[in-house]
């Protein structure tokens, strides 16, 4: 199954800006990989909360629509809140 997530590039980086994003129902994330520069991104929490319940979300390639470009990635790591059904941060790896 193919999943697509619409995202924007993040300009503010750090703990304070990440907390502000989470309060606004956004998820900070990063895309990295060998030989490529890391890209900090942000997307809506509602875009990922339902699709992450499917098992193939973690093993298949995802498409991130990033400023008019489609970037193929795989989920490397996902950090969740301790007791709330919230995703706090996602690490993606270039596919």
UniProtKB/Swiss-Prot annotation:
Keyword Disulfide bond applies: no
Function recorded in the entry: This is one of the proteins that binds to the 5S RNA in the ribosome where it forms part of the central protuberance.
A Gene Ontology biological process term: translation
Cross-referenced CDD domains: Ribosomal_L25_TL5_CTC
Molecular function in Gene Ontology: 5S rRNA binding; structural constituent of ribosome
Assembly notes: Part of the 50S ribosomal subunit; part of the 5S rRNA/L5/L18/L25 subcomplex. Contacts the 5S rRNA. Binds to the 5S rRNA independently of L5 and L18.
HAMAP family noted in UniProt: Ribosomal_bL25
Family recorded in the similarity comment: Belongs to the bacterial ribosomal protein bL25 family.
Designated name of the protein: Large ribosomal subunit protein bL25
GO cellular component terms given for this protein: cytosolic large ribosomal subunit
Keywords carried by this UniProt record: Ribonucleoprotein, Ribosomal protein, RNA-binding, rRNA-binding
The organism of origin for this protein: Shewanella pealeana (strain ATCC 700345 / ANG-SQ1)
InterPro entries given in the database record: Rbsml_bL25/Gln-tRNA_synth_N, Ribosomal_bL25/Gln-tRNA_synth, Ribosomal_bL25_short, Ribosomal_L25_dom, Ribosomal_uL5_bac-type
